[in-house]
Amino acid sequence: MSKIIAVNAGSSTLKFKLYEMPEENVLAEGVIERIALPASHVEIKYGDGKKYEKTTDVKNHEQAIQILLDQLLDLDIIKEYSEINGVGHRVVAGGEYFDKSVVITPDVLKKIESLTELAPLHEPANVLGIKAFKKVLPDIISVAVFDTAFHATLPEKNFLYSLPYEYYEKYSARKYGFHGIGNRYVSQRAAELLGKPAEDLKMIITHLGAGASICPVKNGKSFDTSMGFTPVTGITMATRSGDVDPSLLAYVMEKEGMTDINEMIKVLNTKSGLLGISGVSADMREVEAAQATNPRAKVAREIYVNRIIRYVGAYLAEMGGADAIVFTAGVGENSITIRKEVAEGLNYFGIGVDNEKNDVRGVVRDISAKDSKIKTLLVPTDEELMIVRDVQTLANK
């Protein structure tokens, strides 16, 4: 029996989930927010619905980890630090270096640091978390689990852009994809639900959260993904644009007097998507609530659904059909109407949902209509569980 902690470090946040393995029992989970900012907030959920909260000052990630571990002791979740046998770090970009999870060595850490250009908003924070945990718990196994690794199986025809080939040779300019940790978990859980090995199935995973992507999985391996070199491409998201004609960006920059491309990249990442079109919110629930009286909210939602249908339809053609369409992540797990409308838009392919079965949120369920040729599944994602499983596998080698 061992205790393994899964960590997702952001620039000012530290999310964690502590598991007892191999039973996969969650002992505690929580977040430390506003690190290096005034009035940092600590929240830990544990036991049978218990919650600890505190507002304090947290100067950096190292102090955040120290506070977290001390609080786990105070709450009697652990008796001593040595009970924690391993830590798994979610790392956004693995580039072409990493096609699977790895034990973090000095050389591995250097390579991760060299990949910050691929995920400038996330990778530096991931590195901070790794270094901070190494300082506080230097003797335990530390594992990097990459969001891009699942997509290392993409064929060239799906990861190369139609740009001069030398850009790929010189700069590794290609599609990397994201949401890979969640995609891997969901594909395995969906296979269990269908009662078949993942290697014998074709499925399309629709990860619909604040960030959103579509991933066709063929014989247990990622075959393509709607996200690209960065997470901004693909379908419409909460604040990200999804696919846009690059020439339009140059046109708008000239009209708006923008001289720095990073200004436009910020617009694409933080001011577009549902928020940009609706002018109401990045939250689908608020957009849905406003659509009856707000035409922009209505069309934002229509664009969102239409882009999903477009990508799923293309991937169905590309893979020669599928055994299942799988909904996951915040919107996918909780929006009954989005699931219904996407299925209706794909009815031509023999996809449909049963209204009664679909009337649920956040559970594992087959929600297919009786006469469906392709199953429709609801599978909540669990990235943290995937991370700690990888840590345990590597620790046992």
From Swiss-Prot:
Q: How is the cofactor bound?
A: Mg(2+). Can also accept Mn(2+).
Chain sites annotated for binding substrate: R90
- List, alphabetically, the InterPro entries matched: Ac/propionate_kinase (IPR004372), Aliphatic_acid_kin_short-chain (IPR000890), Aliphatic_acid_kinase_CS (IPR023865), ATPase_NBD (IPR043129)
Query: Which top-level group of life is the source organism from?
Result: Bacteria
| Residues that, per the record, bind Mg(2+) | N8, E383
Q: Name the coenzymes or cofactors required.
A: Mg(2+); Mn(2+)
| Site for Transition state stabilizer, residues | H179, R240
Pfam families hit by this protein: Acetate_kinase
CC annotations in GO = cytoplasm
What do we know about how this protein assembles, alone or with others?
Homodimer.
Role of this protein: Catalyzes the formation of acetyl phosphate from acetate and ATP. Can also catalyze the reverse reaction.
* The protein's name in its UniProt record: Acetate kinase
Q: Upper lineage ranks?
A: Bacteria, Bacillati, Bacillota, Bacilli, Lactobacillales
Encoding gene (name) = ackA
